[in-house]
Amino acid sequence: MKADPNKEKALAAVLSQIEKQFGKGSIMKLGEDRTMDVETISTGSLSLDVALGAGGLPMGRIVEIYGPESSGKTTLTLEVIAAAQREGKTCAFIDAEHALDPIYAKKLGVDIDNLLCSQPDTGEQALEICDALTRSGAVDVIVVDSVAALTPKAEIEGEIGDSHMGLAARMMSQAMRKLAGNLKQSNTLLIFINQIRMKIGVMFGNPETTTGGNALKFYASVRLDIRRTGAIKDGDEVVGNETRVKVVKNKIAAPFKQAEFQILYGQGINRTGELVDLGVAHKLVEKAGAWYSYKGDKIGQGRANAGRYLTENPAIAQEIDTLLREMLLNSNAPKESAADVDDNVDPETGEVF
């Protein structure tokens, strides 16, 4: 059926008016691959960068990463910090859980000598530190670990068992209103790690929710749901996790994509394994039987050996990475480059129904 030209003209006019009033990218077609022209930082996972649509996490925005315990939330943020530091950016880690392991961070490539770290006593103190760092304009990436550990001062000073209904949610709501504008002006990326809780009495739908009230869900430009889907074994020994990340909210590109990758204990995201898998999928790396080859040269028998070869030859790994990014982040990239999420999702908050 042919579209009404008057309606098309009216739609184009109102879309132009909305973008002029609220900013480019405030409205787009769901299937569009066009992304907002924003600076991004890689997540350390090529498949996740592709799922995000813009090549990484956006600067000047709020990002929420949530999931169950030991799913890889902190590992993912440390990978982002390492990537930012390699670009010469200044990073800060607000360790409200008092659980940051500097040895592990160093193994992931974080320059711990130049990483700003704070272990605040109260939630208000943590958020004030975030605001001060943001307003300085000198810090590029701030990670808060975690929202659940941001305890209001009144709760800390009170007795165990006292009721403090809504205090944390009110604190987060006030902080979001204050931080959002400052982050945009200073072009600072603020990442909140969050935990999952269960709603009581939910009979139908997803009973899971995140801590800290609803404000963060609405102010976040990107929300990532990270889950451990399986174990990676070397013989009988478990050496890592199979991980799936769902982009449940995305204001800079089409949302509802997902990425799968491996997190190896003590090493972080298995980048070379991703390069081998994506290289084969997009015909940059040839596979014949168990042998993998690149540009006619054999690089290993079996996925593990091919990945090891790329680790030992970073120039070749970087070449494959660059070619894949050009292919997958291009506007003409194939649709299957990032899988769609099947769940019914609230388009405003990214919550699953």
From Swiss-Prot:
Signal peptide: none annotated. GO terms for cellular component: cytosol. GO terms for biological process: DNA recombination; DNA repair; SOS response. Pfam families: RecA, RecA_C. Keywords: ATP-binding, Cytoplasm, DNA damage, DNA recombination, DNA repair, DNA-binding, Nucleotide-binding, SOS response. The keyword DNA damage applies. Residues 334-353 are annotated as: Disordered. This is Protein RecA. The lineage of its organism: Bacteria, Pseudomonadati, Pseudomonadota, Gammaproteobacteria, Alteromonadales. The gene is recA.
